[in-house]
Amino acid sequence: VEHTVTPKEVTETYRLVLESERVLFETVLRRLTAKQIAVLTAIAKEPTKKLFAAEYMERHNLKSTGGIQRGLSVLTGEDLVEQHPAEDIWTVVDPLLWQWLAEKAL
């Protein structure tokens, strides 16, 4: 039986996958400090080259460059964020976690 997958079915399946990963994502967040979560969420919502720019920090309520640096140290060590060498942009490594964080109001 052939069936053409509709955009609605793709969207619904994607939502189900995100929901099925929710417990894992929440476990990841429980291991992090509030400052680390703030950095991770900022990167998910707005990947950037200019993580330490005053405007970016203000938009995402990031308090200090030192806090960002410490957060990045942990987040890169846990393989949660990376800086792409070619574009020099900070992003969340796991695309599902990225989407979940970007949509979530933390």
What is the predicted role of each segment?
Residues V1-V23:
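Amphipathic alpha-helical "lid/sensor" segments that cap RecA-like P-loop NTPase cores
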Residues E19, V23-L106:
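C-terminal leucine-rich, beta-strand-based interaction scaffolds used for sensing/assembly
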